[in-house]
């Protein structure tokens, strides 16, 4: 197949996962995030839920510009710096095909989750690994994500983010797998 444009110029659909925010708090609205995405060249931006999940289309070469625009919008609105984790929709589809939760010997499960790692960070320790409270179990990992299940212990669910951050020494963001399924069901 002959390409008429460089791979870097080809449009792709991406998802942005913003760490540690709730849309509607601290002046951070959906419109602020969608407008920041559009101003940076992200076309057809769409917001999912209230936890900072945005999809958009842009050339691969422009992805970092959109990331910076979203990080700036969060900083201006909330006064905090929070990282944005970008993944292509194709990468998310590959993660879904991996079927990390498929054999599910992890019952009873409260949530199935995915934790996104910053670029250049990789989970290399053996899995599965459980938290000291046994409310989180890390079950699978790729070069840019860790899959986990959470359980209710003492009436409270665990969350994988703090465990992964402690082990790797980096900031991460975690999403319920249902959020990823929702994005993949309708990424436009």
What are these regions (language model features)?
Residues 2, 10-188:
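Surface-exposed, charge/polar-rich loops and edge strands
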């Amino acid at each position: 197949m002959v390409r008429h444009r460089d791979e870097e110029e080809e449009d792709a659909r991406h998802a942005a996962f913003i760490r540690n925010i709730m849309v509607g708090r601290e002046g951070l609205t959906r419109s602020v995030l969608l407008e920041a995405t559009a101003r940076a060249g992200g076309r057809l931006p769409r917001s999912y839920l209230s936890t900072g999940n945005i999809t958009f289309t842009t050339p691969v070469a422009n992805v970092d510009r959109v990331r910076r625009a979203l990080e700036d919008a969060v900083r201006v609105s909330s006064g905090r710096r929070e990282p944005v984790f970008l993944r292509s929709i194709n990468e998310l589809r590959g993660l879904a095909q991996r079927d990390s939760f498929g054999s599910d010997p992890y019952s009873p499960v409260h949530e199935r989750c995915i934790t996104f790692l910053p670029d250049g960070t990789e989970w290399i320790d053996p899995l599965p690994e459980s938290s000291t409270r046994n409310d989180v179990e890390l079950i699978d990992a790729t070069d840019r994500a860790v899959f986990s299940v959470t359980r209710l212990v003492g009436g409270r669910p665990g969350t994988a983010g703090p465990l992964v951050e402690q082990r790797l020494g980096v900031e991460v963001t975690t999403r319920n797998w249902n959020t990823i399924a929702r994005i993949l069901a309708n990424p436009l």
